[in-house]
Amino acid sequence: MAKMTRKPKGTPMSCSENTNVDAADPLETLDDGVAAAAFRRLVRHLRHRHDAQNIDLMGLSGFCRNCLADWIVEAGAPLDKAAAREVIHGMPAGEWKARFQTEATPEQLARMAESMTRNP
């Protein structure tokens, strides 16, 4: 299993990244192939559910598609931010935004801000 490492002090966290890995966590016993298959299924599900807006994902869970893109880069994918977002969105991020993203409401922005305070 790939070991997560702590970023240098002062490095910004992505969607409140938590790199504290507890070896006793059952998640750490998952085979990497199984974990990768589940991750790919999640990404494909989010590609299909473009009606689930990133702002709503942030408001409910404190992460979104863009966070997933950041996380694959932080995990070592040799991609820049734009390429990583294209992998997750299934198309360039600008195209995804133009086709599917709606204007965020003040309520959505407030939910996101409150949700982010609960991230580790």
Please report, for each region that a protein language model flagged, where it lies by residue:
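Domain-level signature for proteins that mediate thiol-based redox and metal-cofactor handling
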Residues: 2-120
